[in-house]
Amino acid sequence: MPTLKDIRVRIKGVKSTQQVTKAMKMVAAAKLRRAQERAVMARPYAKKLKEMLGSLSAKVDTSRNPMLSGRSEVNKVLVILVTADRGLCGAFNTNAIKLASKIIHEDYPAIHSKGGVSLICAGSRGFDFFRKREYNIVKGYSAVFQHLDFSTAKEIADIASGMYLRGEVDRVLVAYNEFKSVLAPNLREEVILPIAPEIPGTESSSDYIYEPSPSAIIDELVPKHLNTQIWRMMLESSAAEQAARMSAMDSATENAKELMRTLNISYNRARQAAITTELSEIVSGADALTN
């Protein structure tokens, strides 16, 4: 049975941990507000680019642009995995890594067995996981979300598009956490190459005059679209990470509070038992002297 000193030490340790988790929750809440604003602001631009690409694609022969025309066979795949740089954010990293593993081992098992699956890992957690297991990692990024910058998204897009255009991969997918709300993260898997533009129907399409030609605009728009989509996904993941961390630290704080309550009850019971034992010894000693 633990002594009073042991229980006091444990109560002190739990209280110290509770203060840390409470502070981390407050920091995550502040970061979440900023990350959420950036993610929400990026959505309309990315959506409009996608709509423009779809509208223009209806006017031209998309087979002329290799990034819009899919390959007849998929023999090599590139998976872009977006995780966090740190832990203490619940199942955020685990879920993203599980999704990437599912893509590799369940969606493309034959290609993986032939060594045809490559990875780009944005975030230390995913990078470390797959590096230790000796997967084919084209590029790994660590500490990328401490100072998230558009240049990183552009670099990833350039690597992916370069590999696709050179025929080194036939399909590019992204596995990431999309931010929906604090309590409802959304794990997503999206194919970004080849690009599948959403061509509007005849009812929603408008008659525009394009200058220069639609094909020339598409050639300029495709790289911008790819850069923007990857940037949006990284912003979504950043916001989802902070939401997951805030939720995890809130749960940890509540658990610490409950544990302290249990320890205080144990401490009071042990103290009461010690006092009762001392009183019994005093009474027994007094009776012995009387007799």
From Swiss-Prot:
Molecular functions per Gene Ontology: ATP binding; proton-transporting ATP synthase activity, rotational mechanism
InterPro entries documented for this protein: ATP_synth_F1_ATPase_gsu, ATP_synth_F1_gsu, ATP_synth_F1_gsu_CS
Location(s) in or outside the cell: Cell inner membrane
Transmembrane segments: none
One protein family per Pfam: ATP-synt
Gene3D superfamilies the record matches: 3.40.1380.10, ATP synthase, gamma subunit, helix hairpin domain
Topological type in the membrane: Peripheral membrane protein
Keywords recorded for this protein, A-Z: ATP synthesis, Cell inner membrane, Cell membrane, CF(1), Hydrogen ion transport, Ion transport, Membrane, Transport
Ion transport among keywords: yes
GO CC, one annotated term: plasma membrane
GO biological process: proton motive force-driven plasma membrane ATP synthesis
Alphabetical list of NCBIfam families matching this protein: ATPsyn_F1gamma, PRK13425.1
Subunit structure and binding partners: F-type ATPases have 2 components, CF(1) - the catalytic core - and CF(0) - the membrane proton channel. CF(1) has five subunits: alpha(3), beta(3), gamma(1), delta(1), epsilon(1). CF(0) has three main subunits: a, b and c.
Record function comment: Produces ATP from ADP in the presence of a proton gradient across the membrane. The gamma chain is believed to be important in regulating ATPase activity and the flow of protons through the CF(0) complex.
Similarity field: Belongs to the ATPase gamma chain family.
Name this polypeptide is given: ATP synthase gamma chain
Encoding gene (name): atpG
